[in-house]
């Protein structure tokens, strides 16, 4: 750059010689005439203008201007950019990152005496003054590069003001065609030139200049119009970009209609560059011969916002945007953080594992197609790292677009994974995945997983439930099980594996519904809409609408041995000044005693091996725990589980409407299996990258818990059985009477059965005998008459003889029973036919 090494010339020397106050007289008078020629006839007006000039502030700083924010994930262990977000499309660059051609074009095109003046071009002002006096207009403004920089800085400051009215006033003051504005601009330009070097001013100008639309700065313009960096701009490209700044509305390269006017101005600038000796004749001729058309202009549309983020990470990008209010690195309060984010320049390094994200996102699109027309099918997959709360995966089956430019069933700006306040929906009922919090509270109260409870569906009075938060409840509550044959007693472990509704209601009847909710809250569980958790009896079976992210983090707390970590999405932030700032702190606390968490995990492991979650199991050698969830009519389906390293929640269901997924067939599989297929696919990749080991064993004290062994009641009378159970803290309920060989009214069997463990206070169901059965007595070896008598005495009424011939040598056995049908010891009805085989020497 020929002029870049020049010292300040005559204008600058004049300013230094005369001093700012004397120079202000010249500038003030010239400005007065420049912006309002009619005022020139009045010396009083000129004097007034000088007074105004002297009273104006003379302090202005070159500050960092709004820039792009960049969001990064991790791919193959290295950062990868997934999104660019900005209020203004600008990337500030350093002096050595700008082409010499661009530096020269700016000076040649905007302020050829830039290196010779003291912030304002006195010659230019004089020339413009003469022109304006002659024409009676204010056509020529004679703004130097420094003045233009001042104006742009003031415009940027105006745009940061909080209200529309304040911004309007400030913008008028910064850019309006008024004498006051021009005088102020001149004063500040003179001051700026005294404070900063020419290089600093020129670079700041190139970084702040507007190039049409929302594009600011030479780097963003180079990328948008030529798909290159500012450092690599050619002479023709640089001159074309500088041609834009005076009149972007008619010279911007965004519109082909502007190409002719842009070329005309470009060629003028190239001529000045040649005249100044900044380019050779050959360079000039080559540049002028370069057309401004679609062959040379390469439009690269700015990809601003999450709609233009990586296709695999758009919803996570939106979650980061919504989480800015939580990033303490950006400021002391949410308002400051939002303002700093708007100003930009931050590089945000997130927790997202791009490798896992890609797998989960592809599975969501393939297995749960949002284009499905038979229902509004939605799905979400969220993975959270155990022990840290770091969000590794956030995928869903729709395509993100918050611009309104696309529409259809497959498009949504709603993030199914998150709470409503973070761009999410109102959440979805989690069904039986919520039962785990009853299991945990059961263990917290000293109960064991081998205790047996009634698993039958039935109707109970809601007044029998304890709820210290919102009770008492009134009216009947009717509930059933998923399978018709699920009834009778179940151990808590078996009920967990098979997801037996009745068993968990029985457990909750021995607990406090409020305390169950508190256990859930300790693991971060809350409603997605922000309302308090409901605690009515049906809440045990999962009626509170929650976000998948919430459930994934809660299960991660169980997998960690009881340490809950709230979900975080940002590892670190690099500020506009290059300083490393903290990300989101892992806010962890002990939510559960390790004995409780490990015993619950022990029960949850059976879900994956022989229970309702078996279809989700990757069977890759990594131990998993989990729980399935299906709401009424299978409107919503869930699979939530974890290894020792990562927890994953998958929701598949109706975004709106009530189409049963069990009746929905897609790709040869019913809708209720989609969750399993997505979870299995995701966790296969998770386990290969984050291999998890064995879970700790259950606490021995919580296997039996505080339960009591049920005694053997068979053969006891009801009073005897009642007394024995009462002494152990149980109650007795007769559920049926059956045919039995035991005396009428005596106990045949109990549920839970003898030897099982039941909670103190449990009702033990018994079945009694009606006495209509008898055991076949032993009659073989008796004389037929004696055998018949014994059978008659036992109540048998139909007896017949079958003659078995004897050899003469066995005459001593004549008349003896050699066999009976049925055989001895068999339980039969007294009305059944009894056949006796009798040996006879003569049949």
Task: Cite the ranges covered by each PLM segment.
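Juxtamembrane regions of bacterial inner-membrane/periplasmic proteins
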Residues: 2-365, 369
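Short pre-catalytic segments that frame enzyme active sites
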Residues: 70, 76-91, 220-224, 245-256, ...
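Residue-level preference for non-acidic, small/hydrophobic
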Residues: 79, 106, 149, 201, ...
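Bacterial peptidoglycan biogenesis and beta-lactam-recognition machinery
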Residues: 98, 108-121, 134-141, 192-197, ...
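Structural recognition of the beta-strand scaffold that forms the well-ordered cores
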Residues: 108, 144-151, 203, 232, ...
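Conserved catalytic neighborhood of penicillin-recognizing serine enzymes
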Residues: 134-159, 301-309, 447-516, 576-606
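A penicillin-recognizing enzyme superfamily signal
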Residues: 350-370, 394-397, 402-430, 434, ...
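Ligand-recognition elements built from short beta-strands and adjacent flexible loops
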Residues: 687-843
């Amino acid at each position: 750059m020929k002029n870049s090494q020049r010292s300040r010339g005559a204008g600058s020397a004049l300013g230094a010689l005369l001093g700012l106050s004397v120079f202000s007289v010249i500038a003030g008078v010239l400005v007065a005439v420049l912006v309002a020629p009619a005022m020139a006839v009045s010396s009083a007006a000129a004097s007034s203008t000088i007074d105004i000039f002297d009273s104006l502030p003379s302090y202005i700083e070159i500050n960092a201007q709004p820039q792009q924010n960049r969001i990064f994930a991790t791919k193959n262990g290295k950062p990868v950019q997934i999104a660019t977000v900005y209020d203004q499309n600008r990337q500030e660059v350093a002096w050595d990152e700008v082409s010499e051609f661009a530096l020269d074009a700016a000076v040649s095109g905007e302020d050829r005496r830039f290196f010779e003046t003291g912030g304002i071009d006195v010659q230019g002002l004089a020339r413009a003054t003469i022109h304006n006096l002659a024409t009676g207009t204010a056509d020529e403004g004679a703004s130097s590069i420094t003045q233009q920089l001042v104006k742009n800085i003031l415009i940027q400051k105006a745009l940061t003001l909080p209200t529309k009215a304040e911004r309007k006033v400030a913008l008028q003051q910064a850019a309006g065609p008024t004498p006051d504005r021009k005088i102020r601009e001149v004063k500040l330009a003179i001051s700026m030139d005294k404070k900063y070097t020419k290089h600093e001013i020129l670079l700041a100008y190139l970084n702040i200049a507007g190039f049409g639309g929302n594009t600011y700065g030479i780097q963003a313009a180079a990328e948008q119009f030529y798909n290159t960096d500012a450092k690599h701009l050619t002479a023709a490209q640089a001159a074309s970009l500088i041609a834009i700044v005076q009149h972007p509305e008619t010279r911007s390269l965004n519109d082909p209609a502007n190409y002719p006017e842009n070329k005309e101005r470009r060629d003028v600038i190239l001529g000045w560059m040649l005249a100044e000796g900044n380019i050779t004749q050959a360079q000039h001729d080559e540049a002028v011969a370069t057309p401004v058309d679609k062959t040379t202009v390469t439009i690269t549309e700015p990809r601003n916002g999450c709609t233009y983020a990586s296709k695999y990470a758009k919803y996570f990008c939106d979650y980061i945007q919504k989480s800015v209010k939580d990033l303490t690195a950006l400021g002391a309060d949410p308002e400051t953080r939002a303002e700093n984010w708007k100003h930009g320049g931050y590089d945000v390094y997130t927790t997202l594992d791009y490798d896992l994200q890609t797998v989960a996102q592809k599975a969501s699109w393939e297995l749960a197609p949002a284009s499905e027309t038979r229902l509004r099918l939605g799905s979400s997959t969220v993975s959270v790292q155990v022990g840290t709360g770091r969000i590794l995966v956030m995928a869903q089956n729709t395509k993100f677009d918050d611009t309104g430019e696309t529409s259809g069933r497959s498009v949504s700006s709603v993030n199914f994974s998150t709470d409503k306040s973070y761009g999410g929906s109102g959440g979805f009922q989690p069904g039986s995945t919520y039962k785990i919090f009853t299991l945990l509270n059961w263990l917290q109260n000293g109960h064991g997983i081998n205790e047996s409870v009634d698993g039958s569906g039935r109707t109970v009075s809601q007044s029998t439930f304890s709820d210290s938060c919102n009770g008492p409840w009134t009216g009947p509550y009717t509930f059933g099980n998923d399978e018709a044959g699920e009834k009778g007693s179940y151990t808590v472990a078996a009920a967990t594996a098979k997801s037996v509704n009745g068993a968990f209601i029985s457990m909750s009847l021995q607990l406090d519904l409020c305390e169950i909710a508190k256990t859930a809250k300790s693991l971060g569980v809350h409603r997605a809409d922000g309302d308090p958790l409901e605690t009515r009896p049906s809440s045990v079976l999962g009626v509170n609408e929650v976000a998948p992210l919430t459930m994934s983090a809660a299960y991660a707390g169980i997998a960690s041995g009881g340490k809950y970590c709230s979900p975080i999405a940002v590892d670190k932030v690099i500020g506009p000044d290059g300083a490393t700032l903290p990300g989101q702190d892992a806010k962890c606390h002990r939510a559960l005693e390790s004995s409780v968490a490990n015993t619950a995990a022990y029960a949850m492991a059976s879900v994956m091996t022989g229970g309702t979650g078996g279809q989700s199991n990757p069977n890759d050698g990594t131990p998993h725990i989990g729980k399935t969830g299906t709401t009424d009519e299978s409107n919503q389906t869930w699979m939530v589980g974890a290894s020792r390293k990562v927890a994953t929640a998958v929701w598949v269901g109706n975004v709106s409407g009530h189409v049963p997924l069990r009746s929905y067939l897609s790709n040869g599989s019913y809708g209720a299996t989609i969750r399993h297929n997505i979870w299995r696919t995701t966790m296969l990749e998770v386990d290969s990258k984050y291999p998890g080991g064995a879970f700790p064993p259950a606490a021995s004290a919580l296997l039996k818990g505080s339960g009591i062994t049920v005694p053997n009641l068979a053969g006891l009378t009801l009073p005897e059985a009642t007394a024995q159970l009462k002494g152990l803290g149980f109650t007795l309920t007769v559920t049926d009477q059956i045919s039995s060989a035991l005396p009428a009214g005596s106990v045949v069997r109990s549920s839970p059965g003898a030897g099982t463990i039941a909670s103190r206070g449990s009702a033990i169901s018994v079945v009694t005998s009606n006495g209509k059965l008898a055991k076949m007595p032993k009659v073989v070896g008796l004389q037929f008459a004696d055998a018949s008598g014994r059978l008659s005495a036992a109540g048998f009424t139909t007896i017949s003889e079958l003659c078995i011939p004897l050899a003469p040598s066995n005459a001593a056995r004549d008349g003896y029973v050699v066999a009976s049908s049925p055989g001895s010891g068999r339980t039969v009805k007294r009305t059944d036919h009894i056949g006796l085989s009798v040996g006879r020497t003569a049949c």
